[in-house]
């Protein structure tokens, strides 16, 4: 299906919107499945609660605003799923509900609904939760077999340090298995740890022409080059750690909040990669993907303005 893009607000036929949303949901299923494998029923509850709260909030908002019901476009389902995959496994469920309500009501419907929101709703909710529930959002439990990555034992079963925490300290000796980074047997948010599952999903979206390669490649390549020049930690660990892959492939590529031209997408991806590494290197929080993408969301209209081809004859 060939998609024609224009500057926001984006207006799509219902079928095109719902089909795109379904494709992204399908692409996230491998990562969701891995989260259940490593975390167990806690992941199932987080995903179910976030999706349910997002859908209910969408319905209530549309009724309150006296606008057409938009549940059928699956955008609320996708927002709930993305938010859940960006949450730590032991987060209290009421906090997940609060984040879902914020994502739909504040970050999306206040601006008029899908196509009008300037910032990615799931990332906006995650930023809100990091500020509001800092302790819960930065407490991690060990996945199955976590000792294969960090040497942790059953004594450490309640909480653990994520790879990004070790990377920020420069203590790469604690990270012993690249295979575990690829397969997801590491601490972190439930849907961000299995690089293979996320890359399979991204490949599916590219084949389906739902996204292009420009943002994911420029985002991750910028991170790699930055880490290469910075030294200290192997660049591949930066790319495979935290929310880099899920952010680059599934959040930075959001149609509504990202540039519309190939050149603009590359500029956007480079900006996301640079900001992510700057925040990781100099910020107080070891992760920077969410805030980097949100900052670049704000710059998207400017990028669109300067990267759109000029009409023939205009100087």
Q: Would you name each region that the model predicts?
A:
Residues 1-22, 259, 279-315:
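Cytosolic-side transmembrane-helix boundaries in multi-pass membrane proteins
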Residues 8, 56-68, 104-115, 200-208, ...:
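C-terminal ends of transmembrane helices
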Residues 1-55, 62, 310-313:
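N-terminal signal-anchor module of multipass membrane proteins
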Residues 40-53, 90-99, 181, 185-195, ...:
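Structural signature of hydrophobic alpha-helical transmembrane segments
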Residues 118, 122-123, 236-244, 264-268, ...:
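Loop-to-transmembrane alpha-helix initiation sites
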Residues 116, 121-198:
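Long hydrophobic alpha-helical segments that form multi-pass transmembrane helix bundles
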Residues 75-151:
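A generic, well-ordered mixed alpha/beta core segment in the N-terminal half of proteins
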Residues 26, 52, 74-82, 97, ...:
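Hydrophobic alpha-helical segments embedded in the membrane of multi-pass proteins
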């Amino acid at each position: 299906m060939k998609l024609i893009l224009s500057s926001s607000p984006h207006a799509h036929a219902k079928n095109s919107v719902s089909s795109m949303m379904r494709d992204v949901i399908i692409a996230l299923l491998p990562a969701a499945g891995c989260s259940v494998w490593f975390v167990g029923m806690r992941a199932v509850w987080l995903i179910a609660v976030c999706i349910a709260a997002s859908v209910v909030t969408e319905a209530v908002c549309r009724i309150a605003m006296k606008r057409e019901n938009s549940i059928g476009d699956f955008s609320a389902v996708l927002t709930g799923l993305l938010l859940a995959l960006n949450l730590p496994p032991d987060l209290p469920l009421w906090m997940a509900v609060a984040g879902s309500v914020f994502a739909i009501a504040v970050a999306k419907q206040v601006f008029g609904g899908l196509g009008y929101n300037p910032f990615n709703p799931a990332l906006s909710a995650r930023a809100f939760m990091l500020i509001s529930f800092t302790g819960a959002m930065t407490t991690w439990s060990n996945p199955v077999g976590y000792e294969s990555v960090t040497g942790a034992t059953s004594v450490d079963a309640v909480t653990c340090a994520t790879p990004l925490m070790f990377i920020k300290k420069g203590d790469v000796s604690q990270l012993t298995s690249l295979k575990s980074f690829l397969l997801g047997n590491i601490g972190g948010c439930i849907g961000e740890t299995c690089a293979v599952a996320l890359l399979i999903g991204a490949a599916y979206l590219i084949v389906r022409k739902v996204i292009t390669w420009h943002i994911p490649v420029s985002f991750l390549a910028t991170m790699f080059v930055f880490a290469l020049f910075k030294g200290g930690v192997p660049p591949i660990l930066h790319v495979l750690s935290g929310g880099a892959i899920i952010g680059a492939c599934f959040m930075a590529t959001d149609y509504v909040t990202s540039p519309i031209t190939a050149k603009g997408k590359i500029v956007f991806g480079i900006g996301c990669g640079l900001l992510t590494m700057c925040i990781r290197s100099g910020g107080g929080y070891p992760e920077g993907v969410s805030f980097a993408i949100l900052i670049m969301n704000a710059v998207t209209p400017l990028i669109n303005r300067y990267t759109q081809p000029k009409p023939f004859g205009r100087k």
